[in-house]
C-alpha cells in the first residue's frame, strides 16, 4: 500500500513540460523563418547575420525533447522525469529571457543591493542622438556623463563635511520600446544616497532626497554635458548643440526619477529590478488576427500614442532580429561601490547577503536592523 503523506495540506508539485511548440510565436517563427531568411539573401553577398539566424534556429530547438533532454529523479518520491534542453538565448526565446530576468533580479536583491533605499533613473535621448549610441565607446561616454552628473547633484545637496563620496548603481541598457521598436535608453537602479569615506576607512551612508528644483537643475546639467559630448565627437556642430541646450522643452531629453523603493521593501526592490532586467518581447502581448496579420500590444502608449502595432509575420521577425543584443556585451553594468574593482564592494554587498540570511530566519514583518545608515 502506498505511503500516505504526513501532511495532507502539502500537495507535491508535478513537473509539466512547457510545450513551446504550442505558442503563437513558435508557430510563426517555424512557418516563416525559411522564407524570411531567403528574402534577406539578395544574391549579392548580403544576408542575415550569423548571430541572428543562430538565435532563431536555437529558439526553435529550445524545450523540444527531440533536440536533447536530461533525465531527472525526484529524491522524495523516486519519480523519474525528463527535462528538455534550453537554448539560453539572449534576445528571442521568451522562456530563457524571462528566466534570466528572474535570476538577475534575485541575485541583485540577495547578493548585491544592501537594505537601503533605491531609486530608478531612466534616461532617454533625442532620436537624432539615439541612433549614434550603437557605438560602444560613445555609449560608455554617455553613461559616465550621466552617472557623474547624478553623483555631483547628490553631493551638492549635502552639507560640506569633507571626505570622498561614492555612489552605488547598476545600469541596464535597453535597446527596445514597448512596441518592439528600436529605442536605446538607460535604466539605472541606484542606491538613493551617497557613501562617505576614504578607501582605507569604513563607509558611512547618507540618504539623499532631491527637491523638484534640484531635480530640474540636474536634468539641465545632464542635457548640457551629453550635448557637449556629441559636439566634441563631431556629431553635432556648435550651433546645433547650443540650440538643443536652449530648447524650452528639454530638446527631446527625458530624465525620470520618480520611482523610489524604501529600504525595508525587499519585494518592491526585486520587482523594480525585474522591470529593469525585463526582456524585449512579452509573449502574452502577441495576438493573431489571421494567418497574415499579428497584433502586438503595449502596456503604455508608444510613439504617437500607439498602444498596439499591426504586423505581418515577416515584419515581426524583422523587429525581433533588430532587438537581438550584440554579442560579448553586458546587459547590465555595476558602478561606484558596486563595481567589481571597488575596494568597498565586498563590504557593501556583504550587507545584502547578511540581510538575505536574516530574512530566511525571520518574518518580514519584523523591523529591519539599522545597518544601512551606520558604518559599512
Each model region followed by its residue ranges:
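Beta->alpha loop/short-helix hinge microenvironment recognizer with preference
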Residues: 1-373
Amino acid at each position: 500500500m502506498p505511503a500516505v503523506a504526513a501532511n495532507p495540506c502539502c500537495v507535491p508539485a508535478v513537473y509539466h513540460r512547457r510545450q513551446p511548440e504550442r505558442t503563437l510565436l513558435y508557430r510563426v517563427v517555424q512557418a516563416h523563418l525559411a522564407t524570411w531568411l531567403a528574402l534577406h539573401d539578395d544574391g549579392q553577398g548580403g544576408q542575415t547575420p550569423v548571430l541572428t539566424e543562430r538565435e532563431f534556429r536555437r529558439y526553435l530547438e529550445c524545450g523540444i525533447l527531440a533536440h536533447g533532454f536530461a533525465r531527472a529523479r525526484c529524491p522524495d518520491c523516486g519519480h523519474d522525469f525528463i527535462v528538455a534542453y534550453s537554448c539560453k538565448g539572449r534576445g528571442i526565446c521568451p522562456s530563457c529571457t524571462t528566466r534570466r530576468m528572474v535570476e538577475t533580479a534575485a541575485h541583485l536583491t540577495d547578493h548585491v543591493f544592501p537594505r537601503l533605499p533605491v531609486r530608478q533613473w531612466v534616461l532617454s535621448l533625442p532620436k537624432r542622438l539615439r541612433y549614434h549610441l550603437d557605438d560602444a565607446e560613445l555609449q560608455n561616454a554617455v553613461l559616465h556623463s550621466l552617472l557623474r552628473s547624478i553623483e555631483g547633484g547628490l553631493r551638492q545637496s549635502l552639507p560640506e563635511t569633507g571626505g570622498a563620496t561614492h555612489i552605488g548603481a547598476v545600469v541596464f541598457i535597453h535597446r527596445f520600446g514597448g512596441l518592439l521598436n528600436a529605442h536605446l535608453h538607460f535604466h539605472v537602479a541606484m542606491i538613493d544616497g551617497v557613501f562617505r569615506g576614504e578607501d582605507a576607512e569604513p563607509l558611512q551612508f547618507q540618504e539623499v532626497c532631491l527637491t523638484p528644483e534640484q531635480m530640474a537643475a540636474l536634468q539641465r546639467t545632464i542635457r548640457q554635458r551629453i550635448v557637449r559630448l556629441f559636439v566634441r565627437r563631431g556629431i553635432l556642430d556648435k550651433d546645433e548643440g547650443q540650440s538643443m541646450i536652449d530648447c524650452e522643452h528639454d530638446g527631446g531629453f527625458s530624465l525620470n526619477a520618480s520611482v523610489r523603493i524604501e529600504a525595508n521593501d525587499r519585494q518592491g526592490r526585486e520587482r523594480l529590478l525585474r522591470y529593469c532586467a525585463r526582456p524585449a518581447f512579452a509573449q502574452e502581448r502577441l495576438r493573431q488576427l489571421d494567418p497574415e496579420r499579428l497584433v502586438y500590444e503595449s502596456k503604455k502608449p508608444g510613439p504617437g500614442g500607439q498602444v498596439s502595432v499591426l504586423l505581418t509575420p515577416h515584419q515581426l521577425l524583422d523587429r525581433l532580429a533588430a532587438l537581438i543584443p550584440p554579442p560579448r556585451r553586458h546587459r547590465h553594468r555595476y558602478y561606484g561601490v558596486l563595481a567589481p574593482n571597488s575596494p568597498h564592494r565586498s563590504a557593501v554587498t556583504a550587507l545584502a547577503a547578511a540581510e538575505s540570511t536574516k530574512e530566511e530566519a525571520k518574518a518580514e514583518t519584523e523591523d529591519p536592523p539599522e545597518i544601512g545608515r551606520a558604518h559599512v
